[in-house]
Amino acid sequence: MWQVLRGWRKGWQSPRGALAWAVQGQPCPPCSRAVASVGKDEYTFVVVGAGSAGCVLASRLTEDPNHRVLLLEAGPKDLLMGSKRLQWKIHMPAALVSNLCDDKYNWYYHTEPQPGMDSRVLYWPRGRVWGGSSSLNAMVYIRGHAEDYNRWHREGAEGWDYAHCLPYFRKAQRHELGANMYRGGDGPLHVSRGKTNHPLHQAFLQAARQAGYPFTEDMNGFQQEGFGWMDMTVHQGKRWSTACAYLHPVLSRPNLRAEVQTLVSRVLFEGTRAVGVEYIKDGQRHKAYVSREVILSGGAINSPQLLMLSGVGNADDLRKLDIPVVCHLPGVGQNLQDHLEVYVQQACTQPITLHSAQKPLRKVCIGLEWLWSYTGDGATAHLETGGFIRSRPGVPHPDIQFHFLPSQVIDHGRKPTQQEAYQVHVGTMRATSVGWLKLRSANPRDHPVIHPNYLSTETDVEDFRQCVRLSREIFAQEALAPFRGKELQPGSHVQSDKEIDAFVRAKADSAYHPSCTCKMGRSSDPTAVVDAQTKVIGVENLRVVDASIMPSVVSGNLNAPTVMIAEKAADIIKGHPALEDKNVPVYKPQTLDTQR
């Protein structure tokens, strides 16, 4: 129930702000020139961004008592007076929409008008709080397909194939069903399996089987293809972000300093060697120096922005903004990839959806139960079933993802539901449309120019037609007949290719999976930003560790892969041998001659 106990919306636009409240390699902008300067401090590592990756790094790097780590976060803590209950908007799973409605914990980004989407400006929420987007997301734990990582290896991220990534997924994870060759059993990140007995979830899974798709016991295990119960980063009725998993348990370590509400104004360089960062906190300018490395973990928007503001990026673009060039690296901000999705919505003829949970008294009851015992409808995000299928014959592994919700979502949940309804979120996983982001100005507080270039290829347009048609086919099965009312979206009048294409352009939205803007690859690749060791190419003592370094977007949600990336990078940074497991089987369809 994406609306339960939703917060007050503070306004359509956020205060302009960039990551790491980012960096610039030149004098401070007018808004901060009056800031006083204070002294010098030195650390082994400075990690910029306490999000899905940064929290992992802070924990793993401080396991060595000889490593002194400074963790800088632009947003606030995810606790209020040390309490999760008092910060229920973050920790109550069903309240996830609260933080999509304002900018308190959210960068509140927007794209440029998209030519392929009727010139619409799309909303891109990103976490600005301890835990980053793992404190705002829908808590769906999906790793992607094994072939995604083998593709990374082929694309130049050597040593990032499935055999070398799976052990780090397991290392991070503590699955409630216990360990096996795919799952971890003793990691910090609690993962639970969807287990609702809601009749609409049960009917959806049955309808998928009736449509000819298999049931998969574990879409993160042997067989991704099919429909089944989702894994969730929910533990004992509470969101289990990377802040909960990795940061909270280590805050007492004497070799970790974690700062919040901190605007990093630039990475400090001596020549091409990163030596520290400059940041602003409480109206004062500080410099933190490193004996080893600065690590950027701000995500796919903030990390490239931080690099460009620091003079690392396309030299021509930097000079236009009078930013001194440290290193010409034209791939920074390029290769932007995201998952687009549409909602196919059906009216429900029975009063069993989450529509009633929007009523004020019901909201209060749900909230009180959760505050008292962490149970009830507030203890889940309700996206507990879903699936992965191949769009057509010849596709070797799933390229369409489904999330089912026994409710209706309008405008990212920022508008209340209208009626009893259910929906499937459906989208293609490996779009061919690729975008970019660039600096809007040399002011680190300005959001960058974000241009994802959605639906710019005919292949992507055709794939979304398939998404709509295949969703309708599942919704038309007998299992959903007792609940099926009229189709709300796209609507029964939308049938032809042209009509479906128009619907998709008018209604598709981001699935909140921006990635790939600091592409990992070979140093000989002119589009690469970091090498397979996560080091920024062309400079020294600087790494990027987050979803921005993915060479290509994976076939699924991005939080689990981002945690894996940070776990693997931590071993690389510490000089540990890479974990590897070559003997884990992965399902392959018996034939590619058919779509299912």
Swiss-Prot record:
- The EC code for this enzyme is 1.1.99.1
A GO molecular function annotation here is:
flavin adenine dinucleotide binding
Q: Which residues carry this modification: N6-succinyllysine?
A: K438, K486, K498
Q: What happens when the gene is disrupted?
A: Decreased testicular betaine and increased choline and phosphatidylcholine concentrations. Only one of eleven males was able to reproduce, impaired fertility was due to diminished sperm motility.
Top-rank EC class of the record's enzyme: oxidoreductase
The pathway it acts in is: Amine and polyamine biosynthesis; betaine biosynthesis via choline pathway; betaine aldehyde from choline (cytochrome c reductase route): step 1/1
**Transit peptide extent on chain:** 1-34
Q: Which cofactor does it need?
A: FAD
Q: Which residues bind FAD?
A: 44-73
> Which reactions are catalysed by this chain?
choline + A = betaine aldehyde + AH2
An example Pfam family from this entry, by short name, is GMC_oxred_C
Per UniProt, the keywords (alphabetical) are: Acetylation, FAD, Flavoprotein, Membrane, Mitochondrion, Mitochondrion inner membrane, Oxidoreductase, Transit peptide
Alphabetical list of SUPFAM superfamilies matching this protein? FAD-linked reductases, C-terminal domain, FAD/NAD(P)-binding domain
A Gene Ontology biological process noted in the UniProt record is: glycine betaine biosynthetic process from choline
Post-translational note:
Acetylation of Lys-498 is observed in liver mitochondria from fasted mice but not from fed mice.
Active site at H513 (proton acceptor)
Q: Which residues carry this modification: N6-acetyllysine?
A: K486, K498, K582
List the subcellular locations. Answer: Mitochondrion inner membrane
Q: Name one GO cellular component term.
A: mitochondrion
Q: Indicate the principal place this protein occupies in or around the cell.
A: mitochondrion
Its family? Belongs to the GMC oxidoreductase family.
Q: What protein am I looking at?
A: Choline dehydrogenase, mitochondrial
